[in-house]
Every structure is written in structure tokens, then in C-alpha cells.
């Protein structure tokens, strides 16, 4: 009997036997394993030495059995392939090894698989074998064995019959994403309606701005010590405006009382359009004209000022203030004193 045809005949007899023939099935399995071991020993005998100096590429191949007999209801092929075969592709890229699912049950179409098994073509001879994963590596010796070891460790994780492990959950998420039903990546933001909340409390629309420091026209507290040579930021001589009921900001009115609107009554067209359309441009012009007059008075530094209202710093005051010292300092006489602090300008 030719050795090339012996193994396929053993596999064919095993498939043709009824599972009730337990002893015949056991004997056939032992014969198949014995023949495969003898073939492996022949190959090992021919390959006696490994040349690592030349660093030539070698080919390694291993067949990993898929435990379909122990777990017949679990879909190992589907777990290995993943959605659209992406899991097996990523596994090959990660390990650097070529992986192929071969053997009985590796094809989805069972009728076509049976037809190809009965054919005598050598490329379909694997359909008579047990369901397994063929690992092939073609690389230099050191790298080849390293890739094979990595591939064996990774393929072992896919042969665990667990429906809720990390690999299975990742495949389900990928499948939902590919089908377009993954809503986790789409953010659905809700927008509050009915109440308008100002973003910053510094200035409200139509409201009054609370001044943090004295503005124009504010009166300064008299009697406070004044540093010589510095210009005060408070305007002098301009009367303080009286308090008014309406805000002083031109073009704005007090907002209506805040009301909470329902979702049905609120619309995107509602806003401040009806309140501010009634104002005309004449109101803005009158406000700006009145403002220009007050500005001109503000920059007129001599308007409403009297020389008598300010203290004159002369030599007598300096001599009186230094009377308590034992030896007053002698200050050189100055050429003259300015009558008004803004005289030079």
C-alpha cells in the first residue's frame, strides 16, 4: 500500500463508520496518529541540524486541534474569524504567523464541503482531517520560533468556550459598529428650554452695571491727604449726577419679569425682537448728543474751579511743620510755585 494514499483511506474509513462502532473508531484513530508520528520522525531525521549562522529563513508549521468534540455546541470557527474575519486578520498581523482554519467543518456550506471531500484533489485533502488551525511561519530560526510561540499563546485564548469573555464582548461591539447600530459613539446632548440664564453676571441685558470704582462726575472725599506730583483720577469741579429711577445706560430698558415657559409655548423665533424694535434711532442720537456735552465739561480742567478752594503749599507751612525737630533741614529755595497744578499744560 502506498504511503501517500494510506492516510486519506484511513480518514475516509473513519468518516464512513457509524459512531456506534466504538472500538473500530478507536483503532482507526490510533493508526492515524501512529502514521502521522512516523511521517514526522522521517522529516526530523532528514533535518538533523539547524543553521543559525547563515540566518536563512526556515518554515515552521503546527496544527492546533480545535476542541469541537468536547464542546460541540460552541462556535469556535466564528470566534476565531470574528466579524468579517477581522479577528483572525488582526491575530495574524500581531503574531506574524499565517493561520488557516482547516479540517472537517471549516466550510460554511456543508453540501459543498462534502463534494470537495469526495474529490481526489490534494488541496481538499484537509477536509478529511479533524477541525484544526494550521500555523505557518517563514522567518529566520530565532524569530521563527518566537513567532510560533507567540501565535500558540494567542490562539489558546480563542479556544476557550466562553460566551462572555473579553474577546467575545469586543467582537459584539465591533459587529454592532459595523452594522451601524452603535449609538455609544454618538453624543445626544440635551438643551434646556424655557429659562434663560445669563452666562456672566457682569452685565445683564437691559440691567444696570454696578460700578466697582467712582466713575466720571463722582465727588471725591475732601480732607484726604494728596500726594504731591500725582494726578488724581477723579474729575474735579463736575457736579455729581442725581440718582434716577431709570438706568443711565443709553438704549436699554429694564427687562420684563422672568417667566418660566413650557416646552409647547417656547419657540426658536421668540426673543428680544419685539421689545427692542420699538426704539428708534432718535433716542440713541439724543443720548449721544447729551453725552458729548458732559465729556467736553470733563476735559475742561479749569471749569468751576477756584484757587481759594485748594491749599497753597508755601515755605511757611514747611517751616511750621518742622518746628518739632531739633535741627530742621535746610531746603534750597525754589524758583517759584505753580498756582495751579495744571498750569504748565
UniProtKB/Swiss-Prot annotation:
Molecular function via GO: RNA binding
Comp. bias (Basic and acidic residues): 336-345
Subcellular location field: Nucleus
Superkingdom field: Eukaryota
A biological process from GO: mRNA processing
Keywords: mRNA processing, Nucleus, RNA-binding, Transcription, Transcription regulation
Residue ranges occupied by any KH domain in the UniProt entry: 65-131
Gene Ontology annotations for the cellular component aspect, listed alphabetically: nucleus
Entry keyword annotation includes RNA-binding: yes
CDD domains given in the database record: KH-I_KHDRBS2
SUPFAM superfamilies: Eukaryotic type KH-domain (KH-domain type I) (SSF54791)
Stretches the record annotates as Disordered: 178-224, 321-345
Pfam families, alphabetized: KH-I_KHDC4-BBP, Qua1, Sam68-YY
Function: RNA-binding protein that plays a role in the regulation of alternative splicing.
Family affiliation: Belongs to the KHDRBS family.
Name of the protein this chain belongs to: KH domain-containing, RNA-binding, signal transduction-associated protein 2
Gene: khdrbs2
Amino acid at each position: 500500500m502506498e504511503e501517500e494514499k494510506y492516510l486519506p483511506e484511513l480518514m475516509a474509513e473513519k468518516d464512513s463508520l457509524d459512531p456506534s462502532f466504538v472500538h473500530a473508531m478507536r483503532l482507526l484513530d490510533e493508526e492515524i496518529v501512529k502514521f502521522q508520528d512516523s511521517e514526522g520522525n522521517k522529516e526530523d531525521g532528514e533535518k538533523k541540524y539547524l543553521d543559525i549562522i547563515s540566518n536563512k529563513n526556515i518554515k515552521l508549521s503546527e496544527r492546533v486541534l480545535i476542541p469541537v468534540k468536547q464542546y460541540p455546541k460552541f462556535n469556535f470557527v466564528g470566534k476565531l474569524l470574528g466579524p468579517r474575519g477581522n479577528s483572525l486578520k488582526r491575530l495574524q498581523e500581531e503574531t506574524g504567523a499565517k493561520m488557516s482554519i482547516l479540517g472537517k467543518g471549516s466550510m460554511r456550506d456543508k453540501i459543498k464541503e462534502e463534494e470537495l471531500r469526495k474529490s481526489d484533489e490534494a488541496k481538499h485533502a484537509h477536509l478529511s482531517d479533524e477541525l484544526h488551525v494550521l500555523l505557518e511561519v517563514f522567518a529566520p530560526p530565532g524569530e521563527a520560533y518566537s513567532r510560533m510561540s507567540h501565535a500558540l499563546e494567542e490562539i489558546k485564548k480563542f479556544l476557550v468556550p466562553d460566551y462572555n469573555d473579553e474577546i467575545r464582548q469586543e467582537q459584539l461591539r465591533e459587529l454592532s459598529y459595523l452594522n451601524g447600530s452603535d449609538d455609544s459613539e454618538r453624543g445626544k446632548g440635551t438643551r434646556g428650554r424655557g429659562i434663560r440664564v445669563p452666562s456672566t453676571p457682569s452685565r445683564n441685558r437691559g440691567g444696570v452695571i454696578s460700578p466697582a470704582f467712582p466713575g466720571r462726575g463722582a465727588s471725591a472725599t475732601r480732607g484726604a491727604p494728596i500726594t504731591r506730583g500725582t494726578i488724581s483720577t477723579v474729575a474735579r469741579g463736575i457736579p455729581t449726577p442725581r440718582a434716577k429711577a431709570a438706568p443711565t445706560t443709553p438704549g436699554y430698558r429694564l427687562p420684563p419679569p422672568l417667566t418660566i415657559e413650557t416646552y409647547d409655548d417656547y419657540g426658536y423665533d421668540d426673543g428680544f425682537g419685539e421689545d427692542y424694535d420699538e426704539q428708534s434711532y432718535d433716542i440713541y442720537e439724543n443720548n449721544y448728543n447729551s453725552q458729548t456735552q458732559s465729556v467736553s465739561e470733563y476735559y475742561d480742567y479749569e471749569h468751576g474751579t477756584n484757587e481759594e478752594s485748594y491749599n497753597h503749599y508755601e515755605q511757611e507751612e514747611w517751616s511750621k511743620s518742622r518746628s518739632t525737630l531739633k535741627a530742621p533741614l535746610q531746603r534750597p529755595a525754589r524758583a517759584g510755585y505753580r498756582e495751579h497744578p495744571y498750569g504748565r499744560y
